[in-house]
Each structure stands twice: as C-alpha cells, then as structure tokens.
C-alpha cells in the first residue's frame, strides 16, 4: 500500500488500551504519519476525552478492566454525537464470536493484535472518508 507521507496529517486518532506497549506502538506508528494521537487506558478515561477532543477514528482494545471494549464501543455508538465515528476493535484473539460481538455493538472493523503498520493505516483509510481531503 502506497500511502503518501502527509495525507493523515492532523487527523485525530484515539487508541484505548490498558497495555502501555500497545498504546506506545500505535502512537509511534501514527505520529510518524502525522496523526494527532490521543490515548486512554480504559473506557472511562476514553469517554471523557472523546467528548472533549472528538477523534476522527477510535481503536479500542476488547479486554480492559472496568469497562471492556464492547461496552466502550456501545457507549460511543449510543451517543448521537459520536455514532458516525468509526470504532475499530483490537483483540489478541481472532475468534468469530468476538468479531460478531464487535459488529453487534457497532464496531466497523476488527484487528488482531499484534497489528501491523499497514493494518492500522489501512483501517484508517477504509473508514475515515476525510483522509484525502480533510
């Protein structure tokens, strides 16, 4: 996939994961592409930041304490202001059940961890319509 260096410049991307390693990996990859990266360790922290920062796309881990990825996604999708914001589920399991459950709560896509740079950027290009002209 040939992605020009700055077509993602300034795009706000949120990564919600209780793993510091995953947050850091995603943040490093995305910042290289010029994205503005917001991170949160769980759904509660994320929801406060989402209403404040209004990211263009949200990556959320499924397995998190307090509020898991499914609950977080459902809360985002139940808010009329953020219903159209694409949510990509992240999971270390590649199960059909998890993918189906992700679709039920309104997730746009499901990525298996560890994800690659191309998978991460591919998801953004697939779901953020303003990427090439924002």
Could you describe each region identified by the protein language model?
Residues 1-12, 118-134:
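Non-catalytic signal-transmission and effector/linker regions of two-component phosphorelay proteins
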Residues 24-32:
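Charged docking surfaces used in two-component/phosphorelay signaling
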Residues 34-41, 49:
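Short hydrophobic/Thr-rich beta-strand motif most characteristic of the beta2 strand and flanking loop
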Residues 53-59:
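Active-site beta3 strand of CheY-like receiver
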Residues 64:
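Receiver (REC) domain active-site loop signature in two-component systems and cognate sites
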């Amino acid at each position: 996939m040939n992605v020009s260096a700055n077509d993602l410049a300034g795009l706000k991307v949120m990564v919600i994961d209780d793993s510091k390693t995953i947050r850091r990996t995603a943040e490093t990859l995305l910042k290289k592409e010029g994205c503005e990266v917001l991170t949160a360790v769980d759904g509660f922290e994320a929801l406060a930041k989402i209403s404040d920062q209004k990211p263009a796309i949200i990556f959320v881990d499924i397995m998190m304490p307090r509020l898991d990825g499914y609950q977080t996604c459902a809360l985002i999708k139940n808010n009329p202001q953020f219903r159209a914001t694409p949510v990509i589920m992240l999971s270390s399991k590649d199960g059909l059940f998890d993918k189906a459950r992700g679709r039920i709560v309104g997730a746009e896509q499901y990525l298996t961890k560890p994800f690659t740079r191309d998978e991460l950027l591919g998801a953004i290009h697939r779901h953020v319509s303003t990427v090439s002209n924002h």
